[in-house]
A protein has these predicted regions:
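Short, basic/hydrophobic alpha-helical segments
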Residues: 57-76
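Acidic, metal-coordinating catalytic cores used for nucleic-acid/nucleotide bond scission
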Residues: 53-55, 77-91, 106-111
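RNase H-like polynucleotidyl transferase catalytic core
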Residues: 14-22, 97-113, 129
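Extended, low-complexity cationic-aromatic segments
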Residues: 1-62, 166
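C-terminal anion-handling pockets and recognition modules
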Residues: 113-169
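Short beta-strand segments
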Residues: 33, 76-80, 102-105, 138, ...
Length: 169
């Protein structure tokens, strides 16, 4: 749970100290989707956090089921080449329900708008904010991500920064 330090301050001659917990490696894993509806009038962010767990194929499938339930429509899914996204369960269970599945090229995070979301969260609202327990870290990550859900300018910026032609309104 080591925080990203962007800026520090201390009196001249005194080294700044940022306290952090160093005994256990705890983390919050996340999965997210930035959705563009057919009307292209609003951009939506859906996410799930998993405290002290990895995002595996089962969790990715659960997230996709939740996403399809929320959207009430077949989706075109564009995913990175993360191994949990390429499991046979995904192809068997998700493809029949969704319209189309495409993968981004491997090692191309600059084409993935969700990567820009994570970078923004780590370097802005969550920077310089150490969490001393897993509950606090999860709460701060959830609050920071929810704050982005209502920022159309940021969500559109993440999409436009990829350079993909998405025809946003």
């Amino acid at each position: 749970m080591a925080p990203l330090v962007r800026r520090s301050w201390s009196l001249r001659g005194h080294t700044p100290v940022l306290r952090q917990r160093g005994r256990a490696l705890q983390k919050v894993s996340a999965i997210a989707a930035i959705c563009i509806p057919p009307k292209r009038d609003q951009v939506a962010l859906y996410f799930r956090l998993h405290a002290d767990a990895n995002v595996n194929t089962e969790r990715a499938m659960d997230f996709l089921g939740h996403l399809q339930h929320q959207l009430h429509t077949p989706i075109v899914l564009v995913w990175d080449s993360f191994q949990a996204h390429k499991g046979e369960l995904i192809n068997e269970c998700v493809l029949p329900r969704s319209a189309h599945l495409e993968y981004l090229p491997p090692y191309a995070p600059e084409l993935n708008p969700v990567e820009y979301l994570w970078a923004y969260l780590k370097t802005n609202p969550l920077a310089n904010d150490p969490a001393f327990d897993l509950h606090t870290l999860t709460h701060r990550a959830r609050c920071a991500t929810r704050s982005v859900q209502h920022r159309q300018d940021l969500l559109r910026g993440f999409l436009q920064h990829t350079g993909l032609s998405l025809r946003l309104a």
